[in-house]
Regions:
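Glycine-rich loops and low-complexity Gly/Arg-rich segments
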Residues: 63-65, 139, 165
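OB-fold ssDNA-binding interfaces and closely related basic DNA-contact patches used
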Residues: 1-130, 173-216
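Flexible glycine-rich surface loops and low-complexity tracts that mediate binding to linear polymers
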Residues: 134-148
């Protein structure tokens, strides 16, 4: 992996690696809570993914084809900005919270992607056995701690009426939004990633980053 590339074909690869549809990510910081959250899918969409410092989440390609995943290779180097691959179970969710972005613009009532680990998925599935399909829930979610010490509290109520998304909001096509890039595209991503982070946090269950977007 070098720090530059040459030629038109490599330029196209690099451009493809830095383009794509931005997707909004649902997350809570320790001590935060969210009310009125709704899971919009019947089941989780299951992947493995790496977090790249400053870039967001990228689906791991190890074992998908004949090529090795460059993110897996880089994640094993000291002080890498690439996190090791994590099991992720992904949902479309409705987040009614209001927030102000870095540009000073206010947003609320948005569809976002929620990535959960297996521990939280088991909690959700247990509640599904009790309350029925996910889309019929209205949730209050709170979180304490981070990494392996994360504790979630999820209260579920059954919805009393059919839910309709606000105008302009729609579900993400998760197969499209989470589709893996090619090895060449991932290498192009790495070529533009500063080595400023550590991969010491190996938690593949509840690790989250304070970032509200992801580039697939």
């Amino acid at each position: 992996m070098g720090w530059y590339s040459k030629g038109f074909e490599e330029a196209e690869v690099q451009a493809a690696a830095t383009q794509g549809n931005w997707t909004k990510e649902f997350f809570l910081k320790s001590g935060e809570e969210a009310q009125g959250v709704r899971i919009l899918d019947d089941d989780s969409f299951n992947i493995r993914a790496h977090f790249v410092k400053g870039k967001g989440w990228f689906t791991c390609i190890q074992g998908i084809g004949d090529e090795n995943c460059p993110l897996c290779e880089e994640a094993n180097t000291p002080k890498s900005p690439i996190g090791r691959a994590q099991n992720q179970f992904v949902f479309n969710v409705f987040d009614p919270r209001e927030y102000t972005d870095r540009k000073g613009e206010t947003h609320k009532d948005q569809v976002k992607i929620w990535r959960v680990g297996i521990t939280l998925l088991r909690v959700l599935n247990k509640k599904r056995n009790k309350y029925g399909p996910y889309p019929t829930w209205v949730m209050e979610i709170s979180k304490m701690g981070s990494g392996q010490s994360t504790a979630w509290n999820i209260e579920v109520e059954k919805a009393t009426k059919k839910f309709t998304l606000p105008e302009g909001e729609e579900l993400y096509d998760l197969e499209e939004a989470l589709a893996p890039k090619t090895r060449a595209e991932l290498i192009a991503v790495l070529n533009n990633t500063p080595i400023t982070a550590s991969n010491d946090n190996d938690d593949d269950d509840e690790e989250e980053a304070d970032i509200d977007w992801k580039k697939g």
